[in-house]
């Protein structure tokens, strides 16, 4: 670049002005290097290819077995985090979009915002927005949907599945706790063992820890909490009673509904005192009346799990549909970039 300060006009007519002075070693002359269009397209291809790979991995986790363990949830969370990182790279590189692609992404990632429960407002597109800003908006929103919506449901279903499995383990012992009475008109039920196991399960899920909290989703050490407003919002979304909203530390959490178990224990107490052998003998009519109430509470627990599983499935489908829109857009952009280099 021409440095005008290195030229000096001659004070005498007819004398040629001095030539530019050579910069000293201590001086630095900056030269802007503008990457060629080919180099830019090559960078786009790398970024788009990486994003396409991460999208495929995310789709595989969405199609796998529903999350019922911490390991499954961790795998899904990692896939979502890697997808978000690859989208951030697209935003930084400014991969260009066609007008149709721009509108498709704006439409897809703006529509679901009102249905989500995000701790922070999701990015909203302006009337005029650059391609880089579109990618940034998509990255922010898919991260919020994954962590604050789908991620919550994954945790809810995992915790509730473990809870119901523990209850099912108690049911599996019922055959050994039920014996015939003195004649064909009575039965003997080991109410002490049944009550003890039910109380143990109630006490376990009355404790607030990473294995018992439905919302917020837990990870790492300690217990994460939310504001009361956020917790109440999810309490309503999960259709759980107020007893599931609990204050903990500086915030609030939503826990498993223990009402059915507590009603079971109450009904057992209503049967009367057991004998010295911990069993209670009753006529068939009394037993059948108790059994009917017990099964009704069991059905309530089963219905709650089925409802939460369906809500999780809906959240999974919403996220999957957004990922499909992304996959189509990125595949199209990748083909365009490759065609430019080949053409």
UniProtKB/Swiss-Prot annotation:
Top-level lineage group: Bacteria
Spans annotated as Disordered: 1-26
Gene3D superfamilies the UniProt entry points to: IpaD-like
GO cellular component: extracellular region
Coiled-coil stretches: 295-322
Up-regulation conditions: Transcriptionally regulated by SicA and InvF. Also regulated by InvE.
Subcellular location as annotated: Secreted
Keywords attached to this entry: Coiled coil, Secreted, Virulence
InterPro entries: BipD-like_sf, IpaD/BipD/SipD
UniProt keyword Protease, yes or no: no
Annotated function: Required for translocation of effector proteins via the type III secretion system SPI-1, which is essential for an efficient bacterial internalization. Probably acts by modulating the secretion of SipA, SipB, and SipC.
Entry text on domains: The N-terminal domain is an intra-molecular chaperone that prevents premature oligomerization of the residues on the coiled-coil region that are involved in interactions with the needle and/or itself. The residues in the C-terminal domain probably form oligomeric structures at the tip of the needle that are responsible for the regulation of secretion of other effectors.
Family per record: Belongs to the invasin protein D family.
Protein name (record): Cell invasion protein SipD
Organism: Salmonella typhimurium (strain LT2 / SGSC1412 / ATCC 700720)
Gene name, Swiss-Prot/TrEMBL: sipD
